[in-house]
Each structure stands twice: as C-alpha cells, then as structure tokens.
Amino acid sequence: MESGYGFRFSDDDVESASSLTVGERLCAAFLPFVAIAEAVFFALTDCLADLLPPSAAASRHRRSAASSYLAAVARKWNHQQRGRVGIGCTSLTLRQLARLADESRCFSVNEVEALFELYKKISCSIIDDGLIHKEELQLALFKTPSGQNLFLDRVFDLFDEKKNGVIEFDEFIHALSVFHPLAPLEDKINFAFRLYDLRQTGFIEREEVMQMVIAILSESDMKLSEELLEAIIDKTFEDADADRDGKINQQEWKEFVLRHPNLLKNMTLPYLRDITTVFPSFVFNTAVED
C-alpha cells in the first residue's frame, strides 16, 4: 500500500483488526494531522451504543451509520424521558438556546436543542450533575472511565475552555461548532493546531506530533513500526517547517494546510447540519421552557 506522501508499507507495518478504526482513518491519508474530528464525534455518539439492540450495533456500517444510529438513540431517549427531565440534567429556555445558536455562528436553535440531548446523556453517565467530567468523556470515547490517555487529555482540555475541570454545555456547543460545514476555515485550522500544541507554546514540535500519533494509535487496532512513524514525521516536517527551526509555527501550519486541504477534510462533519432532520423528535419532545 502506498500513502499520499509516496511511502509504502506492508502488513508487518500495519496490523488492522476492524474497518474504519481511528487508526485506519489516520492512515487513510497517511499524515499525522488527519481524522481527529471525525474520530471524536463518532466516539461521542458511540457512547450511546448500549441503547441499541446488540444486533443493530453489530451490523451497522460505521461510515454511513451516523445518521440512522443517532435517530435510533433519539427515539429510545425520548421514550425513556417522556414526562421528566432527569436529575442533574437541566432544561434550557428558548432564550438560552437562541443565545447559544447565535454564539456558535453555525448551529440553528433546533440544532442546539438536539445536541443538548446528546450532551445530557454523556453528562449523566457517571456523575449525575449535568456536566461532562473527564471520566465521562473517557467513557464516551474509549468505553472505559479510567486510564491515562494523551489524546483524551488534549480533547478535554480544548473543550474545557473555562479550565474548571468540566465541560459545560456552552463549551460543548462551541467546540462542536468548529466541525460544522458552515464554520470558518480559520477556526478549523486553529483547532487542529491547538490539538497538537501539547505544551501550549505556540509551536508544534516533532516530539508532540509523535506523542499524539502514538496515543491515537494505541486506542485503535493498528500498529505502525517506529521506523515508519519516524519517516512520516520526517516528511511532514520537511514540508511544513519552512524556516527549518525544528518546529511548526501557526503561520507555517496554516500554509501547510492550505497546500494540503485534505488535512482538514474530517474537520467538517456534514451530519451536524442535518441533525434535526435525522431526529426531529428531539425538537418537539425535549424539555425546553418558553
């Protein structure tokens, strides 16, 4: 198999157990800076898999299943929650929904309301307080509430804009709005840059890229040889590090992405725009106050 950068790799380099894992998405374009957003949102929706019959969950085709999967979750959720809001899962007023939609610059009021249902389910999975704690995000992403994971730490840190140790609903909406089809390209570029700027120095360094790629692959069924990883990162920095100082600054990153637009293809999730079409029951059956 050959990558977009001209690398060739064999079965010894890549060991894959299932289709469309995080690692396979990463290696589909075969660059370290790919497939983060889609992996995150698929994982967030996958946290609701226990609401579906096992046969349905086992037989779905992952890439095309997002919409039908969320619809099934919506029907099940509305049936279970009819007539009550749930402890710790507060309601929103129409004014609050409108404010969040306006601040997002992308989502409609109905889309914010629909995403509120997803947020409530995640935020009540362990600690029933209507806030997403790191353990709850880890359970959503990796099916386990414990363990160390660099990828989880970075995603949580980017979502937790107020740095108070939890993800509030306005932060949840703000972070997901970056992946909306109508979100400015500049926002997508900046989000991807911040994900890899582990030390928050304003630069992406080689070691940071290596750490993040290893963390992502460790949660998938794919393994790459150390030699191949080094070769990929060498080529990436050769292309992106224009001033050859061993790190990628924000301007270099922007120019790199604009030369390789496929790097951000998974930073746009079309079904975020269709979320109310997929499950309109969210709009009419949720606990929203006038």
From Swiss-Prot:
Gene3D superfamilies given in the database record: EF-hand
GO molecular-function terms, A-Z: calcium ion binding; kinase binding
Record site feature (Involved in dimerization), residues: 220
Residues annotated as domain EF-hand: 111-146, 147-182, 184-219, 228-263
Gene Ontology process terms (BP): calcium-mediated signaling
Tissues expressed in: Expressed in shoots and culms.
Subunit structure: Homodimer.
Protein name: Calcineurin B-like protein 9
Biological classification of the source: Eukaryota, Viridiplantae, Streptophyta, Embryophyta, Tracheophyta
